[in-house]
A protein has these predicted regions:
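Short, glycine-/small-residue-rich phosphate/pyrophosphate-handling segment
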Residues: 110-147
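N-terminal beta1-alpha1-beta2 submodule of the flavodoxin-like/Rossmannoid cofactor-binding fold
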Residues: 1-108
């Protein structure tokens, strides 16, 4: 039986912060159960923010050529996704937000172009989101839940 593939995305700008430490523990746990986990540090990638040039309207693919396509393909090929981001101003880090915004192209593909971005996927994917914040506000994580 093939090991399930999981992508672990480190969305913090700090390599050895609390967010990274928690995701590292989750990665260890997944590997202990037999999963093949690939770790990707978003701060190491060349990711442009969405430029709203509407190239995705043509075929559902983002027109900006950078590391997004490689990460997108790995995520689409995986059975699971782990994402970790610290709280920055009541939302995710800029590294994480850029990646999330770029996935708008899949929404366009699904709802505007051909409505089948995940047609080859017949399984249920699993996801885990880890976030850490330093302030004590009662609504500290509300923005992340909405995002």
């Amino acid at each position: 039986m093939e090991k399930p593939k999981i992508i672990a995305l480190y969305g913090s700008p700090r390599r050895k912060g609390n967010t990274a430490a928690l995701l590292k523990k989750a990665v260890e746990g997944a590997r202990d159960t037999g999963a093949a986990v690939e770790e990707i540090v978003l701060r190491d990638l060349k990711l442009s923010p969405c430029l709203e040039i509407y190239g995705c309207l043509k075929a559902g693919d983002c027109a900006i050529k950078d590391d997004f396509q490689k990460v997108r393909d790995k995520i689409l090929d995986a059975q699971g996704l782990m994402l970790a981001s610290p709280v920055f101003f009541y939302t995710v880090s800029s590294h994480t937000k850029i990646l999330m915004d770029r996935f708008q192209s899949l929404w366009v593909k699904k709802y505007w172009v051909d409505k089948t971005p995940l047609e080859k996927q017949n399984n249920t994917r699993k996801g885990l989101f880890i976030s850490v914040g330093a302030t004590k506000g009662k609504k500290l994580f509300d923005g992340l839940l909405l995002t």
